[in-house]
């Protein structure tokens, strides 16, 4: 994948526009989870260190486009950055007709979604963004699958368009896992619905030596083997699709499960064979034997791609399956890449972040890359690298 990298450029004295992913949860004016800002800090610090005139921006939440709304302001992010950086940091609300930035100063441009035409990749808006800078740095992998003015359009018109360190690392890690993986390659796809992950399952069934399914997805595969799943979340209309995948790829289906009669944090868990699920029960986790089988598979893997838990790990009684799988990935010597919101929450819960080779910051973008789709922002950077 050939793109210009920010790390290959001399940014001294240049006006640098960084599109980061600073879309963080905010409560009462305070950032409540700083993972995305922390991930973006090295890019910002590198540009400042090089003596660039640095602007950074992002979307935050889902405001009505074209309207300022204090609730979605980047002010909490600015306050966070002021605490972390020794450089002066200021928020600029109106910047489309130009902004003065001093060397060594960080200017945060207010939420891009306050600008009319952002989501539609409006050409006039894209040109206004591009006029603000000498170098455009796309560093928001999480929005690379969307063709929007601040992620895609600006890059077509800026003098130079490049990939920031975070985006470059993400593309390298995903390329390593998907293009020429060390084998055996094991892919774990969890989550509630087969329908939302069908193309992912299909793509991975062609790449992975072993495909592991978990959560509600696994229930559809259990049903495909002719077992009753009781009141479990599953998709009856996709049972035939699950049967097809079982014939094309090695997919271990749970042999034992943890069930409950209600979907509740306090519901007691009953461990039983997959043959014995009653009509009033729902499967909320895989059983110990199934979890150990998966742990063995993961122990021998050379590449692991992990997207989604294998049970309702948010409920302590139904956490064990995901915990065993998570620890097996952490203990494995394989190159491991993990992505998706639930997966990141599980990694935090079990404290294994430092044992995963690469943690992807992109949710939808991560899945679309895995599906083999072209990400508009990446395609734009590749195109600009040719000029």
From Swiss-Prot:
Subcellular location: Cytoplasm
Main location per the UniProt record: cytoplasm
Catalyzed reactions per annotation: (2R)-3-phosphoglycerate + ATP = (2R)-3-phospho-glyceroyl phosphate + ADP
EC primary class: transferase
InterPro entries attached to this UniProt entry: Phosphoglycerate_kinase, Phosphoglycerate_kinase_CS, Phosphoglycerate_kinase_N, Phosphoglycerate_kinase_sf
GO terms classed as biological process: gluconeogenesis; glycolytic process
Chain residues that bind substrate: 21-23, 36, 59-62, 113, 146
EC number per UniProt: 2.7.2.3
Alphabetized PROSITE patterns for the sequence: PGLYCERATE_KINASE
Gene3D superfamilies (alphabetical): Phosphoglycerate kinase, N-terminal domain
Annotated disulfide bonds: none
GO molecular function: ADP binding; ATP binding; phosphoglycerate kinase activity
Pathway: Carbohydrate degradation; glycolysis; pyruvate from D-glyceraldehyde 3-phosphate: step 2/5
Any one cellular-component term (Gene Ontology): cytosol
Entry keyword set: ATP-binding, Cytoplasm, Glycolysis, Kinase, Nucleotide-binding, Transferase
Assigned protein family: Belongs to the phosphoglycerate kinase family.
Designated name of the protein: Phosphoglycerate kinase
Native source species: Salmonella typhimurium (strain LT2 / SGSC1412 / ATCC 700720)
Native organism taxonomy: Bacteria, Pseudomonadati, Pseudomonadota, Gammaproteobacteria, Enterobacterales
């Amino acid at each position: 994948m050939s793109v210009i990298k920010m790390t290959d450029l001399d940014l001294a004295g240049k006006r640098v526009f960084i599109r980061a992913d600073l879309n963080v949860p905010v409560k009462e004016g305070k950032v409540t989870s700083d993972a995305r800002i922390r991930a973006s800090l090295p890019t910002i610090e590198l540009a400042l260190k090089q003596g660039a005139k640095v602007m950074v921006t992002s979307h935050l939440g889902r405001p009505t486009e074209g309207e300022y709304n204090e609730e979605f302001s980047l002010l909490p992010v600015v306050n966070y950055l002021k605490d972390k950086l020794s450089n002066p940091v200021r928020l600029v609300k109106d910047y489309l007709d130009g902004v003065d930035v001093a060397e060594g100063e960080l200017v945060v441009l207010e939420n891009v979604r306050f600008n009319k035409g952002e989501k539609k990749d409006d050409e006039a808006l894209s040109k206004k963004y591009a006029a603000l800078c000498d170098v455009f740095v796309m560093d928001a992998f999480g929005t690379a699958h969307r063709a929007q003015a601040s992620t895609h359009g600006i890059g077509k018109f800026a003098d130079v368009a490049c990939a920031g360190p975070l985006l470059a690392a993400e593309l390298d890690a995903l390329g390593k896992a998907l293009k020429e993986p060390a084998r055996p390659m094991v892919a774990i796809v969890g989550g509630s619905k087969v329908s939302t992950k069908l193309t992912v399952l299909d793509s991975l069934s062609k790449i992975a030596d072993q495909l592991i399914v978990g959560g509600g997805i696994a229930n559809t595969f259990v049903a495909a083997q002719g077992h009753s799943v009781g009141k479990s979340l599953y998709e009856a209309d996709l049972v035939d699709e699950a049967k097809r995948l079982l014939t094309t790829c090695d997919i271990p289906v749970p042999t034992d499960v943890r069930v409950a009669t209600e979907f509740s944090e306090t519901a007691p868990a009953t461990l039983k064979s997959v043959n014995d699920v009653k009509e009033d029960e729902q499967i909320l986790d895989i059983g110990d034997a199934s979890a150990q089988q998966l742990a063995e598979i993961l122990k021998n893997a050379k590449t692991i791609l992990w997207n989604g838990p294998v049970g309702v790990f948010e409920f302590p009684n139904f956490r064990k399956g995901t915990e065993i799988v998570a620890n097996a990935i952490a203990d494995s010597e394989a190159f491991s890449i993990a992505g998706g919101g639930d997966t990141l929450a599980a990694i935090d819960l079990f404290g294994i972040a430092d044992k995963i080779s690469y943690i992807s910051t992109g949710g939808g973008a991560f899945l679309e890359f895995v599906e083999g789709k072209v990400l508009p922002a990446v395609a734009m950077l590749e195109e600009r690298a040719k000029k």
